[in-house]
Amino acid sequence: MKARAIVVTSGKGGVGKTTTTANLGAALAKLGEKVAVVDVDVGLRNLDVVMGLEGRVVFDLVDVLEGRARLRQALIRDKRVENLFLLPASQTKDKEALDPERFKEVVRALLEEEGFDRVLIDSPAGIEKGFQTAAAPAEGALVVVNPEVSSVRDADRIIGLLEAREVRENFLVINRLRPRMVARGDMLSVEDVVEILGLKPIGIIPEDEQVIVSTNQGEPLVLKG
């Protein structure tokens, strides 16, 4: 994937978007890239918790957007893996505090001034201002989808909005696949999801209780063992 600014989105909440962002960011950092993961879910931030960094948040994205903090002040370096940084969302503001144009400048600064190789943007669920802000600087997208009808339907809507914004380098992450349910005809197959949505899967992730354990422990699964 060539895109450097990538929005991780879904439409439907609870499909594993934040977990995907955290693990992909950690994996890319382990491969040697300098990575910033950015939480745009203002008012409902979780990326800091999933990464085990919630106790180190001093400034946040809205502080940067509104000029109360410099970008470097708000970035939190992960001590477990070199070159992985978090820009957390605000817990106390609402999404009206977001400004898509100013957010584009923040992402530009991360790439051009701070020297990041990749910026992963954790989008809020839905298609309102939070999504619009998260998608504004994106060159590509990872659409996280569960193999169920409601998730696929919402993902289809999101893909249309991304294409309307000329975000073209888009891929699927099919999460929480249960092969036994697929075999019984109780869950959509990978082929079903790909045919409906028309995007190539870049990752297929089976249901795994270790993901829940690692999330509760604040340690991305790719950093274990």
Protein language model features and the residues they cover:
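Conserved C-terminal guanine-recognition region of P-loop GTPase G domains, centered on the G4
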Residues: 153-168
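Inter-motif core of Ras-like GTPase G domains
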Residues: 128-149
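Glycine-rich phosphate-binding loop used to anchor ATP phosphates in small-molecule kinases
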Residues: 115-130
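P-loop/Walker-type NTP enzyme "switch/lid" segment
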Residues: 40-114, 212-217, 221-222
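Conserved nucleotide-binding/hydrolysis micro-motifs of P-loop NTPases
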Residues: 42-44, 92-93, 126, 148-150, ...
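Walker A/P-loop NTP-binding active-site region of P-loop NTPases
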Residues: 5-70, 118
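Well-ordered beta-strand positions
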Residues: 118, 140-143, 171, 203
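C-terminal lobe/tail of nucleotide-utilizing enzymes
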Residues: 164-225
